[in-house]
């Protein structure tokens, strides 16, 4: 069975997230999703939605076979435990594919890295766009 791992914060779930996960699922047989812990989100504003609620929403998606919260101290721990063939990253995730491949190799984790393209089928495909539009509408 070919396992795929997708990772993300998934704050304010939107069509871009669904596209990312559905495209990830197409690469294998079993999709595992690692949902970022609140304390580990340091590259952007803290999530609005709690980690438990974000996990529950991801678990409810048809394309997701398994979803877990990330480890609070070692982001590679769940990846080692899942042992995926492929790790996908979203088009706007800050990862460099080369750096991630090097980090995985350094830890003896044998997984390919695939960046999923941007979804452009709808206007609100990022949490930031949704928040900005909500603020704009509320402050008119």
UniProtKB/Swiss-Prot annotation:
GO terms for biological process: FAD biosynthetic process; FMN metabolic process. ATP binds at residues 9-10, 14-17, 92, 119. It is an enzyme of class 2 (transferase). InterPro entries: Archaeal_FAD_synthase, Cyt_trans-like, FAD_synth_RibL, Rossmann-like_a/b/a_fold. It comes from the Archaea. Its EC number is 2.7.7.2. Pathway: Cofactor biosynthesis; FAD biosynthesis; FAD from FMN: step 1/1. The keyword Flavoprotein applies. It holds the Pfam family CTP_transf_like. It catalyses: FMN + ATP + H(+) = FAD + diphosphate. The keyword Transferase applies. One of its GO terms (molecular function) is FMN adenylyltransferase activity. Keywords: ATP-binding, FAD, Flavoprotein, FMN, Nucleotide-binding, Nucleotidyltransferase, Transferase. Its cofactor is a divalent metal cation. Belongs to the archaeal FAD synthase family. Homodimer. Catalyzes the transfer of the AMP portion of ATP to flavin mononucleotide (FMN) to produce flavin adenine dinucleotide (FAD) coenzyme. PANTHER family: FAD SYNTHASE. This is FAD synthase. It comes from Methanocorpusculum labreanum (strain ATCC 43576 / DSM 4855 / Z). The lineage of its organism: Archaea, Methanobacteriati, Methanobacteriota, Stenosarchaea group, Methanomicrobia. The gene is ribL.
